[in-house]
Amino acid sequence: MPQTLSASDMVTPGSLSPPTTEPTDGEQAGQPLLDGAPSSASLETLIQHLVPTADYYPEKAYIFTFLLSSRLFIEPRELLARVCHLCIEQQQLDKPVLDKARVRKFGPKLLQLLAEWTETFPRDFQEESTIGQLKDVVGRIAPCDETYRKRMHQLLQALHQKLAALRQGPEGLVSADKPISYRTKPPASIHRELLGVCSDPYTLAQQLTHVELERLRHIGPEEFVQAFVNKDPLASTKPCFSDKTSHLEAYVKWFNRLCYLVATEICMPAKKKQRAQVIEFFIDVARECFNIGNFNSLMAIISGMNMSPVSRLKKTWAKVKTAKFFILEHQMDPTGNFCNYRTALRGAAHRSLTAHSSREKIVIPFFSLLIKDIYFLNEGCANRLPNGHVNFEKFLELAKQVGEFITWKQVECPFEQDPSITHYLSTAPIFSEDGLYLASYESESPENQTEKERWKSLRSSILGKT
């Protein structure tokens, strides 16, 4: 069924080589996790591990894990200020005379950290003050090597391009269409149906994949954390993340839209033979989505066909060859925490890792289940331990799940876009739930007293009839 985005429903770790600083806050050095990473540490120590020196650079996986999870405890702009301050302090960049040999070893590492940060979390740098901090710290090392200034210019140029692309977004990304309640089924001469736009299941599955990847591309990894953020008991600042998950929410709304679009297209035709043809068409589209690795569209199509206004059309379903549909339902069966789907997802992920073509790289997970997995990971483990240390072990697992998703969403779609099809998918009118029931009852009359009473109520509220 269509998904809602509420807290109740939404539900490559690397090694860490510590820099040459002493543990703080009385903590013991070396509380090892996998490959030497700490299972917990104070926030200050974790920040220190992020800061490069002339002889140290943090592991890439540590950088991603900490930048992803740190926003639960400290705002990104404040973290950047702390990192810049530590760099200036440790490398003595505020002195009138710099140790050029030391700075030349440190400079490339600092620029690499800033490049990784701006590349993976560009939204952390939307405020002018953060750009000013970048320019200030790089400006302090620039006298030692003029190429630093050039690299900084390239970094900022790439950042501005990323932010501009994120602001633009695909068609109808954030402001999802509100369902339209038809007063009655429009005449066939007026209503433009999907089969009139695209009658080939494989082509439609490809275009759905296009839409999915385009919308996925705009979801930042930080949105997974910000969707569930609670005020940290040791933090002094108020959480400010309620407006920072717009792309994640829009993607869940897209899933709902596709569910309702499928149901609308099925309930719209006047004749049961035509409705049966539409159902069989969507079964074939769903099968092609499965073969491609587009599990989100697959689940939306199955959910749309399982909506009550569609499933109650018994005379229509009697004309449908359902064997392929039952196979797909079995693959997405929620039994055993979606064990069949998870097996298929692992297979698609393995295929992606060993892919010889861009088509084989495609993995689009059932998104609401991914959100739910992350939600329960967040709810099941405390962010801090009783001693106040950050539970870094939890965030390694969080980063593993989010990092895998980031890899999948960066795949370039190998299918050529058909604007007429993708535009229809994003903008075609759809019934509301009440509109669907009314259309369903008009297609096949109510069978029991409950349905008759609902039909009468809908005719009164939507059509003004008694």
Curated annotation (Swiss-Prot):
Region (Disordered): 1-35, 443-466
Compositionally biased intervals (Polar residues): 1-23
Pfam family, one: RasGEF
GO CC annotation terms, alphabetical: plasma membrane
GO biological process: Ras protein signal transduction
Keyword Nuclease: no
Ras-GEF domain boundaries: 200-446
Keyword Thylakoid: no
PANTHER family (alphabetical): GUANINE NUCLEOTIDE EXCHANGE FACTOR, RAS-GEF DOMAIN-CONTAINING FAMILY MEMBER 1C
Keyword set, alphabetical order: Guanine-nucleotide releasing factor
Disulfide bonds: none
Functional description taken from the UniProt entry: Guanine nucleotide exchange factor (GEF).
Example GO molecular function: guanyl-nucleotide exchange factor activity
Name recorded for this polypeptide: Ras-GEF domain-containing family member 1C
